[in-house]
Regions:
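Auxiliary Fe-S-binding modules of radical SAM enzymes
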Residues: 9-10, 31, 110, 116-250
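Conserved Radical SAM active-site core
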Residues: 1-115
């Protein structure tokens, strides 16, 4: 809370987006206060929205085998609902390519869809391909480019009630992320800097891109680059008068 206050004091114009569902759950436990009270204190300090990660796959079978100490799927959904009902927007994710079945992926998407119908609090869906290198599942083959694109397309069709689909280029790879812009994704993410999580798990993508790099990827996919803020308000539309492309946010 003190850190958020200091950030807002220095730059009140900055939108502070922080804390996954798992981290909010931990904060609530440490504070020993009701969720609503913790959220009110975070809002007063200057928290604006949350990334909403930590869902992985909701399947209880996978949860028990791979991450038994993590926030349960039922509690994740319950917490997300309360966060949305308290006025915060979040993203949502699905980690695929571990030991889950196709049916378990569909169940995960259905639960996200149901919650979105109820709260309208998700602004972006981000499918995340599992990178097995340097993990206890390194014997598993990572999702193919085709499977990664299929996950984007299925997400766009299934979750038509969520406004945006993100093609996270660090996870997908540049060529797949570019192709994803024609498969349902409308957000390529930003320039980033020194990403660690996926690179420690074997990702070979660049750790950062320039704005020019991203614009080139988007234009080559037949889309027009539009810089946005966290809540998808347009900051700069980089299209020119000759562009007839659909927009893609960065």
């Amino acid at each position: 809370i003190d850190l958020i206050k200091k950030i807002k004091a220095l730059r009140p114009d900055i939108h502070v987006k922080a804390f996954t569902m798992v981290e909010i759950d931990q904060i609530v436990r440490l504070a020993k206060k009701p969720v609503a009270e913790v959220l009110a204190e975070l809002r007063e300090a200057g928290l604006d929205s949350m990334p909403g990660g930590g869902a992985e796959i909701f399947a209880e079978r996978v949860h028990k085998e791979l991450y038994p100490r993590k926030l349960s799927s039922d509690n994740w959904v319950k917490l997300a609902k309360e966060i949305h009902n308290n006025g915060f927007k979040t993203n949502c994710t699905m980690m695929y390519g571990m030991i889950e079945t196709i049916e378990e992926r569909v169940d995960h998407l259905q639960r996200l869809r149901n919650l979105q119908d109820e709260t309208g609090g998700f602004q972006t869906y981000i499918p995340l391909a599992f990178h097995p290198d340097n993990t206890k599942l390194e014997h598993i083959e990572k999702p193919s480019p085709t499977e990664r694109l299929r996950s984007i397309a299925v997400g766009r069709l299934f979750l038509d009630n969520i406004p945006h689909i993100k093609a996270y280029w660090i996870m997908l790879g540049l060529e797949v992320a570019q192709a994803a812009l024609t498969m349902g994704a409308d957000d390529l993410d930003g320039t980033v800097s020194q990403e660690k999580i996926y690179h420690e798990a074997g990702a070979s993508t660049p750790q950062e891109l320039t704005r020019a790099d991203i614009h080139k990827l988007i234009r080559e996919a037949g889309r027009r680059p539009v810089e946005r803020n966290t809540v998808y308000d347009v900051i700069t539309d980089f299209s020119d008068e000759s562009d007839s492309f659909e927009k893609c946010t960065v």
